[in-house]
Amino acid sequence: MVTKVLNWINYRLPIVNTFERHLSKHPVPKKVNFWYLFGALASIVLILQIVTGIWLMMPYSNTEEGAFASIEYIMRDVDYGWIIRYMHTTGASMFFAIVYLHMFRGLLYGSYKKPKELVWIFGATIYLVMMAEGFLGYVLPYGQMSYWGAQVIISLFGAIPYIGESLEVWVRGDYYISGITISRFFALHVVALPLILIALVCLHLVALHEVGAGNPKGVDIEEFVDEDGVPLDSVPFFPYKVLSAMPAIGVFGLVFCIIMFFFPEGGGYFLELANFEEANPLVTPEHIAPVWYYAPYYTMLRAVPDPFGGLIVMAAAVAIIFIVPWLDRSNVASIRYKGILSKIAIVMFVVSFITLGYLGTVTVTETGKIMSIICTVMYFAFFLLMPIYTSIEKTYEVPKRL
């Protein structure tokens, strides 16, 4: 009877076929390293953020008078409210950390090379939506840093010639950060952007499963198949890769819980101390700094004296990620088989990005200004010079099999 019901459903809604195509019979490379775990971890944290976000949304008040008070109510009076909030705030930082590592893996092993261009573009779009989602959520507690951080970021729209002032008011919905701003940011944060994010993640996975997952060697496993057309150097995603990822997921869960229970503020990087004070439009904090995952772009913004020029540089720093598939002219995908120029370039890129991140969290000094300019140039040089150094360098022969 159960079998008949399942067959009836599957005939009309191909659940079994979908499960087999994307999980139980989906071939993935049999040899990968720990860099390939971050995609699965990102999916887990995304689910965690959605679930905790729903619970936080229930007692939250999206008004100017009630926003900060409702956060305090959640922390003090709602049963387990404090752990749900810390789970959400810790999850936000962990989500960005995982996605940064996931993107770095893509740069290391050429996860953007033909035919994976759409996989990369969907991933870059996910990152862009995450940045918007994180900013909107950052404003909702209506603490001191939320208020003034939003004021700084939204005021950037005012630097756009001709339409800037009107656009700034339109984004805020008022002439200052008010209840109207909180309400519209709340709607976008809990409804619009999560739906877009989920849709993009689905497209990202479908595109990935269509062209096949990569591997550290950059070998095309589709070249050698058995009589059934299954790649010889592959294993089914489920249960093999799922079970092999379980220890890493357990370690990640342990680290996550340690941070959540013992260091939820993350030394002021996850939750700024100024945000434990209610927003006061009459008192400006001594140092306005973004959350750590926006810090590199904030440093680029500050590196340019002209506000509009800084806005262009900051936007270009994100936009240039989208065209990486067409900048890399190398005939190999993996950094293992690229030349010394690519290896030097990616080391300089990592150093510049981390330095930019640090500079964005500290007060501005003359030395910091010089360093921010140098690191901004290094950041863009990695991308803009990529067509040159990937074309002229000597590469190594890629093995045929894993």
Indicate where each model-derived feature is located.
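Membrane-embedded and interfacial regions of multi-pass energy-transducing membrane proteins
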Residues: M1-M94, I98-L402
